[in-house]
A protein has these predicted regions:
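Residue-level hotspots at or immediately adjacent to binding/recognition sites across diverse folds
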Residues: 1-199
Length: 199
């Protein structure tokens, strides 16, 4: 895992095991990177990790695979959203607040792609399948009030989140079909408060 500052690399791990960085967030002079590190003792595991100014903080034990996909700082607290693999290969959504985990989904297929926090209230954006099949994947947002499906169409996913005032924006795409050579064709969408706009 590497952080580049003005083009200069800073190695967050030593390369002896697999490690990936998925997200970055800056707060003043502090830079946070989120991802995962494969433990040397368990090649099937992955430790959800936050690096603050290059110093690693492990959020999980590494007994299973877990990762941090989005980070946000609010009120001096570090919020990290990601997912952890459960038995059967399904991913559950996890929100860590100052390192303390709380699940925001049940045992379903979940992938986080965005996080926003203000005054302790969070909005998490991602994709979820209730059957663990990619055929029914849909974008969702999660708040302290629960889950809300962004789009009803299957084979649809969100890839980015923005919040402005009371408005929640999700960018993503939907599988429209396949061309004559069976290449997948996607349509880009923007959802504002759940209302779809084709781009």
């Amino acid at each position: 895992a590497i952080l580049w500052t003005d083009g200069q690399p800073q190695y967050l791990t030593d390369g002896t095991t697999d490690a990936l960085a998925y997200c970055i967030y800056s707060d003043g002079k502090d830079v946070y990177v989120g991802g995962y590190v494969q433990p040397a003792s368990n090649k099937q595991g992955g430790i959800a990790t936050i690096w603050k100014n290059g110093v690693a903080q492990s959020l999980t034990s590494g007994n299973t695979v877990a990762k941090v996909n989005a980070i946000c700082i609010d009120g001096g607290k570090v919020y990290a959203a990601g997912s952890e693999k459960e038995s059967g290969g399904r991913w559950k959504g996890v929100l860590w607040i100052d390192g303390v985990a709380q699940d925001f989904t049940d045992y379903v297929g979940t992938e986080v792609t965005g996080l926003y926090v203000k005054d302790g209230e969070y909005v998490i954006e991602g994709n979820m399948t209730e059957t663990n099949s990619a055929k029914d994947i849909c974008p969702y947002i999660w708040t302290s009030a629960g889950a809300q499906k962004v789009a009803e169409t299957a084979l649809c996913q969100g890839v980015g989140l923005a919040v402005a005032g009371n408005d929640i924006y999700v960018a993503g795409n939907e599988v429209a079909g396949y061309d004559s050579e069976y290449n997948q064709i996607n349509i880009a969408y923007l959802w504002k408060n759940g209302v779809e706009q084709e781009l």
